[in-house]
Amino acid sequence: MGARASVLSGGELDKWEKIRLRPGGKKKYQLKHIVWASRELERFAINPGLLETSEGCRQILGQLQPSLKTGSEEIRSLYNTVATLYCVHQKIEVKDTKEALDKIEEEQNKSKKKAQQTAADTGNSSQVSQNYPIVQNLQGQMVHQPISPRTLNAWVKVVEEKAFSPEVIPMFSALAEGATPQDLNTMLNTVGGHQAAMQMLKETINEEAAEWDRLHPVHAGPIAPGQMREPRGSDIAGTTSTLQEQIGWMTNNPPIPVGEIYKRWIILGLNKIVRMYSPTSILDIRQGPKEPFRDYVDRFYKTLRAEQASQDVKNWMTETLLVQNANPDCKTILKALGPAATLEEMMTACQGVGGPGHKARVLAEAMSQVNSVTVMMQKGNFKNQRKTVKCFNCGKEGHIAKNCRAPRKKGCWKCGREGHQMKDCTERQANFLREDLAFPQGKAREFSSEQTRANSPTSRELRVWGRDNNSPSEAGADRQGTVSFNLPQITLWQRPIVTIKIGGQLKEALLDTGADDTVLEEMNLPGRWKPKMIGGIGGFIKVRQYDQILIEICGHKAIGTVLVGPTPVNIIGRNLLTQLGCTLNFPISPIETVPVKLKPGMDGPKVKQWPLTEEKIKVLIEICTEMEKEGKISKVGPENPYNTPVFAIKKKDSTKWRKLVDFRELNKRTQDFWEVQLGIPHPAGLKKKKSVTVLDVGDAYFSVPLDKDFRKYTAFTIPSINNETPGIRYQYNVLPQGWKGSPAIFQSSMTKILEPFRKQNPDIVIYQYMDDLYVGSDLEIGQHRTKIEELRQHLLRWGFTTPDKKHQKEPPFLWMGYELHPDKWTVQPIMLPEKDSWTVNDIQKLVGKLNWASQIYAGIKVKNLCKLLRGTKALTEVIPLTEEAELELAENREILKEPVHGVYYDPSKDLVAELQKQGQGQWTYQIYQEPFKNLKTGKYARMRGAHTNDVKQLTEAVQKITQESIVIWGKTPKFKLPIQKETWEAWWTEYWQATWIPEWEFVNTPPLVKLWYQLEKDPIVGAETFYVDGAANRETKLGKAGYVTDRGRQKVVSLTDTTNQKTELQAIHLALQDSGLEVNIVTDSQYALGIIQAQPDKSESELVSQIIEQLIKKEKVYLAWVPAHKGIGGNEQVDKLVSAGIRKVLFLDGIDKAQEEHEKYHSNWRAMASDFNLPPVVAKEIVASCDKCQLKGEAMHGQVDCSPGIWQLDCTHLEGKIILVAVHVASGYIEAEVIPAETGQETAYFILKLAGRWPVKTIHTDNGSNFTSTTVKAACWWAGIKQEFGIPYNPQSQGVVESMNNELKKIIGQVRDQAEHLKTAVQMAVFIHNFKRKGGIGGYSAGERIVDIIATDIQTKELQKQITKIQNFRVYYRDSREPLWKGPAKLLWKGEGAVVIQDNSDIKVVPRRKAKIIRDYGKQMAGDDCVASRQDED
């Protein structure tokens, strides 16, 4: 490719080599850049020969420009190079790349304007439509194309998916290309649900608009004819400008790009939002010691996009920070690549760097370079070795701090603290040893920064207990338990290297907890030695072994064996580390804490500790001391006012004790959590796996940190015996057992931790429920166990241990109460107790065991056992077993004698579910894929209503099994049901409440399900017709039931202790008893009709059971319901017959009036039921029979929760006329009027009329020109009304008025034929809506509701004034149990016989005779020795 040098002539080449790559930079363009550019062009399939001319360069730039926004850094570099080359060809003088890009942009703008001018002059009608909302039409006018739904959809999708991550900004910029302010507001409206983000955006836009107004003051005097006014800040934001004005400004000559300006403001706001959602700074992005370079680069660029900086600054960040913040291993490689390395080269070079594998390779290489393996090494061998020097000031290699040109870094170069220089620094290597032990005579120094780091949940650390020959526990005892969090430590983000003193020489050595021995590089040590061979990563090396050698590490001494030989690095091994008391500590967990809050308005628990026995106090002190050492709890002082009781119980079948904290009070006060897992996993859903392991996470909750701000609320106190000393106070640092938030936070944290492992190993199945883990794979057992170890290490890195004790490697596996075998599963063995007498608690436990067993043992029944538990009984109450329950229990014992197993799920086969009827409303089912190999079994015995039939129960059972199958396997089974298709069809077609059931087939398993009787669809010709009715008096409970027939027969019976519903059923029973084999029955009871139409064959009601018996005996029965009895003679007669002396009000009288009212006003059913005292079913029937009310169904009247003074206004159009609608948001009350024109004058007049009738505080409108006019603003100012608009100035939607517009139009449609003019119909519709439709809050009409809201508001304000006055009083009171006066408490309410007070957070009612009310005169009232102050101190 050397031929590419011909691109430039000699003179041009000179110019080329004078142009700088960056403004103010040292590097300049060279020939190699042209060669590189030609190679890159070939990669992109562009002819490199185009570089030789300016026209060719222009074509290349045109090709590359669209890719700049989405392209890589290489494309940007190529574009910059070609742009500079174009300037050299065109003989345009430029000093650097930036100038060249500016010149190119200038030229492009000129050519664009020229092209537009030419197009305008020639009236070019065939112009291709650009992707901008403003285009030129055939007449040459600039018209607006609204932003497309597709664009809006893309914008909503990116916000929902990315949640304001940095990618949102370029996406918004691309989608909003050329948009008008109105389009931009539409885009913001679509994501208006993100209230916090929109509020921030609104503030930014307000600031920018104010700044625009400040920089562009309004010119004095009138605007010249033909000229446009200059836009204000609010015009640019689209609030006070029309679309035509916006188009005018954007297409004017010269143009004012209001769209681009507004877009820039929005992007500024989006930047702030992104910073809020992605708070990490680019300076904080550092590569972890074992983090792959690729992951680090991803994080780096993601954060870089969120930075608010120019492209130049971002380029500089990429060049410097990317390398600078890499870990030491990657940094060495990146520096070796040189400054001009591409990202691709960097990622290739750093592939596989980091972690133990990399360490092994480095050590192997280092050891292979050690040529001399002689036992004795001469000093001369080290003469020419030069150590690389590194500057303390700037951190660069090659010079020392004395010669450094960089500005001097503040403070000490060693420890980073200000106030001293490095030569005076008393710090040792990373404060490695405890100061009070390293320097016993000296004064211990502060460890503030180290302590902070020790408590940090994100650090890994190596910690030392400095001691002589004490054990760690003894040392801890000597220091009175102060060990835990005051230990110095060194984090493992860098290699733990310390300075050691051995044989009078100072050396640097690596602390290696993985090395058994201490190995030092060649040096002379006193005493005898013996030769030895030791194995290293690179093979075996010969060393000299010296025994009893004294080593001093930072002033602390240890004596042990030291090996001397050709090691690439000095290593202090475990033989000396154990003497020093060095421990490798895993912090609690480096995962992020989940923020937790108390419920609004609540404070933490303040429950007193109850007395404990001496034994329990000792146990608790012991447990808490151990927990404190482990960092699970910390001591707190008296400044923490919260407390929760603590106690201890003995563990089951053990002498060990267990600490329990009664968190009931804290649980009441803690926010609610969404339970991450909605149920437990089931073994039938497990796929058969070749290898399986079950793990248990040890101390699960104690491995997850608790939110720091919430810890104070978990405080508890261990009391002392006889109050000898103040109690010891602790608070939790981790998730406590028994606290309501622990399960949800633990499960969420565990899921996050397992996510990367699941992604890396998609073939491994991990079922996670709390601390139980089931891991299955199809790997060979050896590979599987390797993966298990990887998983255990992965969990360990996050602070979760998996104890060997609960690590199950071989089957059967005990998991979640199940027993898992390689090809089958069962429940863990179940033993039913043998008892002579059964208590309520015993039966509850028995039912629980049987329910658990029923998932694999088919045929288990518990209905009769459950009947024993009906009613409220004490747990210890003895219950005799009924004969049925005895029999049921005996059957269950027989079933459980034979062990039954389930098989595992095979995704390639279909699921089949088979149901059998067991009688007495009990059903059993099996789910399988192959016959006789059940996945799981179960039972169903629930009666959803008092009256049911087998078909209905069968449907409910099928739906239960379907739901269960979807949860376990994610699909529905095919059903085999004991019911014939004809029976099912006969019931299903008539019974409208039957819901969907999946695919099924008939299986002839007795007993079959059948319908015992069927109701006729049409009246039976020739059969006697019975008009039945019943009535009861609510007070006396006396009633009558009877019938009248079309053949003149009649009968009435008197009833006692009855209800209206019972009498109606009794009447039907009479009719059935006294009729032949065929009968027509007419009733006015919707209740009775509902029961019988469902064709029940069993019922808990004796009366309904008797009716069922009668129905089964009949050949044909027709049952009808008549809502309006008038006109049906039989019904009128029977009404008079049964209601004599019984009914107080007959609802039938109101039906006619209600129907008349509905024909006029089309009132909804609630209004009619309320006004005419009708039963809801009758009122609904009247609405249902009205053809005009069935067009769009019943309107929903849900209310928006808003303050009483807010109204929404909008204009809607009907029949070519304009209707101005105002809605009172809180009540739904409407004011509407037909206005002659949509002008500011008419709108202002309407608003003033509205303000004269109702208290209007705020009006909320859209950005229509009539609402934004100065006339309306003046009217609002005069009436003291605040005006609000849509986004961005107020994110509240126009939803209420929009829905009311539709509702109003619907009502107008119902009454339009009653009025000649539309304005009359509008007022009729307003009247109907406000006073004839009830529903929503309080069941009122809108008119009643607005009056109620305003009245309540006035009362509340008055009450508030009184409350404010009453709160100035304090109350001293006496409890009934204690003679001492308590207080002072706050007075909340004062009644005739009692007062309501608030003492701390408790609200109490105290009788007046036990309360003294005084005015709050301030603190001086309570003297030092007054009763109140003494009480507080206690």
From Swiss-Prot:
Q: Where does Mg(2+) 1 bind?
A: D696, D771, D772
Report keywords, A-Z.
Activation of host caspases by virus, AIDS, Aspartyl protease, Capsid protein, DNA integration, DNA recombination, DNA-binding, DNA-directed DNA polymerase, Endonuclease, Eukaryotic host gene expression shutoff by virus, Eukaryotic host translation shutoff by virus, Host cell membrane, Host cytoplasm, Host endosome, Host gene expression shutoff by virus, Host membrane, Host nucleus, Host-virus interaction, Hydrolase, Lipid-binding, Lipoprotein, Magnesium, Membrane, Metal-binding, Modulation of host cell apoptosis by virus, Multifunctional enzyme, Myristate, Nuclease, Nucleotidyltransferase, Phosphoprotein, Protease, Repeat, RNA-binding, RNA-directed DNA polymerase, Transferase, Viral genome integration, Viral nucleoprotein, Viral penetration into host nucleus, Viral release from host cell, Virion, Virion maturation, Virus entry into host cell, Zinc, Zinc-finger
Site note Cis/trans isomerization of proline peptide bond applies to G221, P222
Biased composition range(s): Polar residues = 116-128, 449-459
Question: What is catalysed by this protein?
Answer: Specific for a P1 residue that is hydrophobic, and P1' variable, but often Pro; Endohydrolysis of RNA in RNA/DNA hybrids. Three different cleavage modes: 1. sequence-specific internal cleavage of RNA. Human immunodeficiency virus type 1 and Moloney murine leukemia virus enzymes prefer to cleave the RNA strand one nucleotide away from the RNA-DNA junction. 2. RNA 5'-end directed cleavage 13-19 nucleotides from the RNA end. 3. DNA 3'-end directed cleavage 15-20 nucleotides away from the primer terminus; 3'-end directed exonucleolytic cleavage of viral RNA-DNA hybrid; DNA(n) + a 2'-deoxyribonucleoside 5'-triphosphate = DNA(n+1) + diphosphate
Q: What is this protein called?
A: Gag-Pol polyprotein
> Motif Tryptophan repeat motif: which residue numbers?
984-1000
Provide the active-site residues from the annotation.
D512
